[in-house]
């Protein structure tokens, strides 16, 4: 591994195992191509969070938030508590991409309106943001003429998604999953490269740091076992595929011989669903079913598959 830091400068390190924990970065204005002027006053929600919470700077007095990700929702509340006027939260999708509790605690409790199926179509201003135009969008996410709304604000916060930092992962030739924008991992968080493990937001974007911590502990334990015992001898593998209505499954591969009692599978719904069942099938046979009263893309789901069910898989795929 080639690395560098302030204390030691450039270094070359050798190890029997590597854990990738690079996290993710925020999607910026340039990444989503918002039209309009380029004045000061447009921040990612995470950058604004740092300015307010750590640096002690107020980023604006009248704020509009684009996107309903959790960081944006939390910053809506934070800006309100700091004395700013948050005029609204604008979301392109017909549903929120944040946790429901954040919608309630950060928007509803502060009377901040949420505009679903809307987006910013113009930002106006000379040196500083002065006005933002918001339009309703159709089913193809295209602005609908005649639905424009004007907001006189001096600040725009962007909460429009996170991108896993996988430049190192790709350069190592590790197999990637387009659905998660992260590496394909086994049940023990090992990637397609022997001895290289990954966890946290570099694998897939999590809702809570609690999930990141648990996943990272699993990766750390697995890396230590690899150093001690070497690669798993039985490489017989089951592929876990996305079915109708679900996306971003992790782990994507499971080696039953490496599973003790159960395997936890995490994923997101493709849309908002109520009173549904998550079914695990192999070769047309239903192995397990899990009921859910509500599922939404903004909330990660988890099911637990017992090892006994994995032993019933015949075609190497569920």
Where are the predicted features?
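Surface beta-strand/loop "capping" patches
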Residues: 231-273
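Feature captures the FAD/FMN-dependent oxidoreductase FAD-binding
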Residues: 1-25, 64, 71, 122-129, ...
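FAD-site-proximal beta/loop scaffold in flavoenzymes
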Residues: 20, 42-52, 155-206
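Rossmann-like NAD(P)H-binding beta-loop-alpha module
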Residues: 40, 46-96
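A conserved FAD-binding loop/helix module that cradles the flavin
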Residues: 199-244
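Residue-level detector of alpha-helix initiation sites
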Residues: 24-26, 69-71, 163, 203
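FAD-binding core/adjacent interface of flavoenzyme oxidoreductases
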Residues: 1-62, 139-146, 157, 184-185
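A Rossmann-like FAD-binding core segment of flavoenzymes
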Residues: 80-167, 261-293
């Amino acid at each position: 591994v080639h690395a560098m830091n302030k204390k030691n400068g450039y270094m070359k390190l050798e190890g029997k195992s590597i854990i990738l924990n690079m996290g993710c970065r925020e999607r910026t204005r340039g990444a989503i191509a918002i039209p309009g002027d380029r004045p000061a006053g447009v921040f990612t929600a995470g950058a604004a969070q740092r300015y307010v919470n750590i640096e002690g700077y107020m980023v604006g007095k009248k704020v509009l938030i684009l996107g309903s990700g959790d960081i944006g929702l939390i910053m809506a509340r934070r800006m309100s508590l700091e004395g700013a006027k948050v005029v609204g939260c604008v979301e392109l999708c017909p549903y929120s991409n944040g946790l429901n509790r954040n919608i309630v605690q950060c928007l509803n409790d502060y009377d901040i309106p949420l505009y679903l199926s809307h987006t910013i179509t113009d930002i106006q201003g000379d040196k500083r943001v002065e006005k933002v135009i918001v339009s309703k969008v159709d089913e193809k996410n295209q602005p609908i003429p005649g639905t424009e709304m004007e907001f006189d604000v001096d600040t725009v916060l962007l909460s429009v998604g996170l991108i896993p930092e996988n430049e190192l992962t790709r350069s190592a030739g590790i197999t990637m999953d387009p659905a998660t924008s992260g590496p394909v991992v086994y049940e023990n968080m090992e990637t397609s490269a022997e001895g290289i493990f990954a966890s946290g937001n570099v694998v897939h974007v999590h809702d809570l740091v609690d999930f990141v911590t648990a996943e990272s502990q699993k990766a750390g334990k697995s890396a230590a076992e690899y150093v001690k015992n070497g690669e798993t001898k039985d490489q017989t593998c089951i592929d876990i595929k996305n079915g109708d209505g679900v996306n971003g499954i992790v782990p994507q591969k499971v080696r039953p011989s490496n599973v003790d009692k159960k395997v936890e599978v995490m994923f997101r719904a493709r849309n908002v669903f109520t009173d549904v069942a998550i079914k695990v099938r192999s070769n047309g046979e239903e192995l397990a079913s899990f009921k859910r009263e509500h599922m939404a893309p903004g909330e990660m789901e988890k099911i637990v598959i017992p090892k006994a069910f994995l032993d019933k898989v015949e075609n190497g795929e569920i």
